[in-house]
């Protein structure tokens, strides 16, 4: 089987983690070996970086610092988890990847896209997903969901204007890469989304 790397993207509260876990269960039932991971995080080093990035007490983190920290966590995850697992024939399911940096730091914060592309290339070694599943949701609804049961983290404290830019960035990237993007309306039911994801991924895996 070819190396299969599947990424879930979307604004906060779009249901990425839920759908990733449902897909993992579906593939496991088909006796397909999988591993689930996330960004930032997925390794001991990455999880420490995640704590720093999401801590609301560090609101002074500069944009460039933020982007480099995300890339550092990504470099560790690719080297320690993603690439070795792919080489073993494991299907890798990842909650966020490179396009999160482009959407949040590029479109959201207005950082130079070419600079972000360079550090992403260095961090990932050019490793790109076979498919990116974008769960598209109006930011108002996403933030309402994500803030429902816990305090907002540093990024969730950003303005709605910021999140609208992030969403627009995702949709623009999806238009540029139609062959590798699956864009779904995240306002659908959990079951409806799961069926569509399984259909697309099942076709990719031949199951």
From Swiss-Prot:
A Pfam family the protein falls into: Thymidylate_kin
Keyword Kinase: yes
Keyword Methyltransferase part of the UniProt annotation: no
Transmembrane feature ranges: none
EC number: 2.7.4.9
UniProt GO MF annotations: ATP binding; dTMP kinase activity
Record-linked InterPro entries: P-loop_NTPase (IPR027417), Thymidylate_kin-like_dom (IPR039430), Thymidylate_kin_CS (IPR018095), Thymidylate_kinase (IPR018094)
Domain of life: Bacteria
Catalytic reactions on record: dTMP + ATP = dTDP + ADP
Matches recorded under NCBIfam families: DTMP_kinase
Family, as annotated: Belongs to the thymidylate kinase family.
Protein known as: Thymidylate kinase
Organism expressing this protein natively: Desulforamulus reducens (strain ATCC BAA-1160 / DSM 100696 / MI-1) (Desulfotomaculum reducens)
């Amino acid at each position: 089987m070819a190396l299969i790397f599947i990424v879930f993207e979307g604004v906060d509260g779009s249901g990425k983690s839920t759908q990733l876990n449902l897909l993992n269960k579906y593939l496991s039932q088909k006796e397909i070996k999988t591993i689930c991971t996330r960004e930032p995080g997925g390794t001991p080093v990455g999880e420490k970086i995640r704590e720093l990035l999401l801590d609301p007490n560090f609101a002074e983190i500069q944009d460039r610092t933020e982007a480099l920290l995300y890339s550092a966590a990504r470099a560790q995850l690719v080297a320690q988890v993603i690439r070795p697992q792919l080489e073993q024939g494991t299907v890798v399911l990842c909650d966020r990847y490179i396009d999160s940096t482009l959407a949040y730091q590029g479109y959201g914060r207005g950082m130079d896209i070419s600079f972000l592309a360079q550090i992403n290339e260095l961090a990932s070694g050019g490793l790109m997903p076979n498919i990116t599943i974008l769960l598209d949701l109006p930011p108002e609804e996403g933030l309402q969901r994500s803030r429902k049961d816990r305090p907002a983290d540093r990024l969730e404290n950003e303005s709605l204007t910021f999140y609208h830019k992030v969403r627009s960035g995702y949709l623009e990237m999806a238009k540029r890469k139609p062959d590798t993007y699956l864009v779904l309306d995240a306002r659908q039911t959990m079951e409806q989304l799961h069926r569509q994801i399984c259909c697309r991924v099942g076709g990719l895996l031949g199951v």
